[in-house]
């Protein structure tokens, strides 16, 4: 889990009360934050906190103080942040590689060395927790007084512009930054097809080249009083939430005032930041059933307010208002968790379930364990991938046209929005990630896939499958056929083989596996186009088989 260091004096200033060490160590765990240690550094008392990744709003002293004021009851409810209007505009051109951007101003901040360090630390922690090391989200924080609006967000070629990157005194082109600058070298893999996102002001000065580096021109110093924040990325939800976390944290500082920026794209205007709260509904009956408690609606509402939410009891339901900087509340169960946090986990007592049976391993899992032993005996290594992926990996790279799949309604990431119906594409992606490793590579995975089934109660069905791939200099159809037949023989499955045309395999080099006339799997030589799509350079063979 990420950790942050906070000066005790600063925390006391933000909480607005003196805090004893014992009080800190007792109360912060109540809000899900571990106190890793309290120590002296350069004459200052420092507190190290360990933050759960699902609470990125706690990655700053400001966010911690806001939550702490609620949990100890000195300031409860959803905090409202005033957003002042401005005439600042950002015009967005077609930026294919990072299509989403949000921007805001925070004026009147007082930045000393510690606050400056705190801002930079928050930025870097969010790059990891929200941004997947800048791949999904990248943040730029600038001295707003050094540039002149309106601003422009567009793509340029590698030699299309020159500017001085942060921590440098030399003008460079975007391509030169990737070759010479420390950050450019580190994040060069995030730039594709010689398309470089750039943020400019009205005079053509460069603020940022996301997700690589800011310009030296807008460096934030202790003299800075007005901050301009940009957040770019591949996921709109993550971009907007990241901006909300930053501006609300900065607004916790004395004199910090949030100012809006109008973002204009395709003749449509959006005002950022959008701090409108989300709304969910629950009931006291549901909360009490989940927690095993007997709380009145009024008590539940009070507990929610201590977690810095707001709530109202309307028509026998509890309407819950969730602040715009929270990214961890999606349904009723999350509301129940908030109540449990404020109520105090230490107040819950356990009960032994009244069960008169003895558990044992599921028969299907026993079969899967047996298959694992067989595959390891064949020299394969087991891998485990996520069940969520995207159409690029599951279909486009595999040369498959398929619209019959299950998609997540509100995905946390654009890269993880489709429930897989096949394991083979994810094994190809694993080979791509490990293409620098020595050959041969033989990997397999056993796992669940989800297919649409209109006759099922949930309109879907979970299918247990095994898939395997081999990449080597000279692998071929006969090699994968021998492994598949060996596996079927060990499982004592009576089967037939027949020719099969599958877009991911070479025509005439693919076979289907039939059991009682039904297709239960297939294998063969992967199509060269698929191999190229996954950036591989050697032949690949693979198979996929239903286990149940």
From Swiss-Prot:
<dbReference type="GO" id="GO:0009328">
    <property type="term" value="C:phenylalanine-tRNA ligase complex"/>
</dbReference>
<dbReference type="Pfam" id="PF18262">
    <property type="entry name" value="PhetRS_B1"/>
</dbReference>
<feature type="binding site">
    <location>
        <position position="334"/>
    </location>
    <ligand>
        <name>Mg(2+)</name>
    </ligand>
</feature>
<dbReference type="InterPro" id="IPR009061">
    <property type="entry name" value="DNA-bd_dom_put_sf"/>
</dbReference>
<dbReference type="InterPro" id="IPR005146">
    <property type="entry name" value="B3/B4_tRNA-bd"/>
</dbReference>
<dbReference type="GO" id="GO:0006432">
    <property type="term" value="P:phenylalanyl-tRNA aminoacylation"/>
</dbReference>
<dbReference type="InterPro" id="IPR045864">
    <property type="entry name" value="aa-tRNA-synth_II/BPL/LPL"/>
</dbReference>
<feature type="binding site">
    <location>
        <position position="337"/>
    </location>
    <ligand>
        <name>Mg(2+)</name>
    </ligand>
</feature>
<feature type="domain" description="B5">
    <location>
        <begin position="275"/>
        <end position="350"/>
    </location>
</feature>
<protein>
    <recommendedName>
        <fullName>Phenylalanine--tRNA ligase beta subunit</fullName>
        <ecNumber>6.1.1.20</ecNumber>
    </recommendedName>
</protein>
<keyword id="KW-0460">Magnesium</keyword>
<dbReference type="GO" id="GO:0005524">
    <property type="term" value="F:ATP binding"/>
</dbReference>
<feature type="binding site">
    <location>
        <position position="338"/>
    </location>
    <ligand>
        <name>Mg(2+)</name>
    </ligand>
</feature>
<dbReference type="InterPro" id="IPR005147">
    <property type="entry name" value="tRNA_synthase_B5-dom"/>
</dbReference>
<dbReference type="InterPro" id="IPR040659">
    <property type="entry name" value="PhetRS_B1"/>
</dbReference>
<keyword id="KW-0436">Ligase</keyword>
<keyword id="KW-0547">Nucleotide-binding</keyword>
<dbReference type="Pfam" id="PF03484">
    <property type="entry name" value="B5"/>
</dbReference>
<dbReference type="GO" id="GO:0003723">
    <property type="term" value="F:RNA binding"/>
</dbReference>
<dbReference type="Pfam" id="PF03483">
    <property type="entry name" value="B3_4"/>
</dbReference>
<dbReference type="Pfam" id="PF17759">
    <property type="entry name" value="tRNA_synthFbeta"/>
</dbReference>
<comment type="similarity">
    <text>Belongs to the phenylalanyl-tRNA synthetase beta subunit family. Type 2 subfamily.</text>
</comment>
<dbReference type="InterPro" id="IPR020825">
    <property type="entry name" value="Phe-tRNA_synthase-like_B3/B4"/>
</dbReference>
<keyword id="KW-0963">Cytoplasm</keyword>
<dbReference type="InterPro" id="IPR022918">
    <property type="entry name" value="Phe_tRNA_ligase_beta2_arc"/>
</dbReference>
<feature type="binding site">
    <location>
        <position position="328"/>
    </location>
    <ligand>
        <name>Mg(2+)</name>
    </ligand>
</feature>
<dbReference type="GO" id="GO:0000287">
    <property type="term" value="F:magnesium ion binding"/>
</dbReference>
<dbReference type="InterPro" id="IPR045060">
    <property type="entry name" value="Phe-tRNA-ligase_IIc_bsu"/>
</dbReference>
<dbReference type="InterPro" id="IPR041616">
    <property type="entry name" value="PheRS_beta_core"/>
</dbReference>
<keyword id="KW-0030">Aminoacyl-tRNA synthetase</keyword>
<keyword id="KW-0067">ATP-binding</keyword>
<keyword id="KW-0648">Protein biosynthesis</keyword>
<comment type="subunit">
    <text>Tetramer of two alpha and two beta subunits.</text>
</comment>
<dbReference type="InterPro" id="IPR004531">
    <property type="entry name" value="Phe-tRNA-synth_IIc_bsu_arc_euk"/>
</dbReference>
<dbReference type="GO" id="GO:0004826">
    <property type="term" value="F:phenylalanine-tRNA ligase activity"/>
</dbReference>
<keyword id="KW-0479">Metal-binding</keyword>
């Amino acid at each position: 889990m990420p950790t942050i260091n906070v000066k005790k004096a600063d925390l006391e200033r933000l909480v607005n009360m003196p805090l004893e060490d014992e009080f800190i160590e007792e109360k912060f765990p109540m809000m899900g934050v571990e106190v890793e240690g309290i120590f002296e550094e350069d004459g200052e008392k420092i507190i190290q906190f360990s933050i759960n990744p699902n609470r990125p709003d706690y990655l700053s002293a400001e966010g911690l103080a806001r939550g702490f004021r609620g949990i100890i009851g000195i300031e409860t409810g959803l905090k409202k942040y005033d957003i002042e209007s401005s005439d600042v505009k950002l015009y967005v051109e077609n930026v294919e590689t990072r299509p989403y951007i949000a921007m805001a101003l925070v004026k009147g901040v007082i930045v000393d060395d510690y606050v400056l360090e705190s801002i930079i630390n928050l930025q870097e922690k969010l790059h990891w927790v929200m941004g997947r090391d800048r791949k999904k989200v990248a943040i730029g924080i600038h001295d707003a007084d050094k540039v002149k609006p309106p601003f422009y967000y567009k793509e340029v070629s590698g030699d299309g512009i020159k500017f001085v990157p942060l921590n440098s005194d030399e003008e460079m082109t975007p391509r030169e930054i990737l070759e010479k600058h420390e950050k450019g070298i580190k994040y060069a893999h995030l730039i594709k097809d010689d398309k470089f996102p750039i943020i400019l002001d009205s005079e053509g000065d460069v603020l940022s080249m996301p997700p690589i580096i800011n310009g030296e021109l807008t460096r934030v110093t202790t003299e800075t009083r007005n901050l301009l924040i940009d957040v770019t990325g591949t996921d709109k939800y993550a971009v907007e939430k990241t901006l909300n976390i930053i501006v609300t944290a900065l607004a916790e500082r004395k004199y910090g005032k949030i100012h809006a920026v109008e973002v204009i794209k395709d003749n449509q205007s959006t005002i950022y930041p959008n701090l409108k709260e989300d709304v969910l509904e629950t009931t006291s009956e549901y909360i009490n059933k989940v927690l095993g408690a007997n709380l009145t609606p009024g008590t539940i509402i009070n507990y929610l307010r201590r977690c810095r939410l707001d709530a109202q009891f309307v028509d026998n339901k509890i309407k819950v208002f969730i602040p715009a900087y929270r990214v961890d509340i999606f349904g009723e169960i999350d509301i129940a968790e908030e109540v449990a946090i404020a109520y105090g986990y230490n107040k819950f007592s356990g009960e032994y379930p009244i069960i008169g049976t003895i558990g044992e391993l599921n028969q299907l899992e026993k079969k899967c364990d047996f298959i694992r032993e067989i595959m390891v005996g064949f020299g394969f290594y087991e891998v485990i991938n996520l069940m969520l992926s995207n159409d690029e990996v599951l279909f486009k790279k595999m040369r498959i046209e398929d619209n019959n799949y299950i998609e997540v309604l509100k995905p946390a990431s654009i890269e993880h929005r489709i429930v897989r119906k096949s394991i083979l594409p994810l094994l190809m992606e694993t080979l791509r990630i490990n293409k620098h490793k020595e050959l041969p590579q033989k990997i397999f995975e056993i796992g669940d896939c989800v297919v649409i089934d209109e006759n099922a109660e949930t309109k879907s069905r979970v299918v247990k499958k095994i898939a395997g791939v081999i990449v080597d200099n000279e692998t071929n159809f006969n090699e994968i056929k021998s492994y598949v037949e060996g596996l079927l023989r060990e499982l004592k499955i009576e089967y037939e083989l027949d020719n099969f045309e599958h877009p991911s395999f070479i025509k005439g080099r693919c076979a289907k596996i039939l059991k009682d006339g039904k297709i239960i799997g297939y294998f063969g030589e992967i199509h060269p186009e698929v191999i190229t799509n996954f950036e591989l350079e050697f032949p690949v063979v693979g198979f996929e088989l239903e286990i149940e």
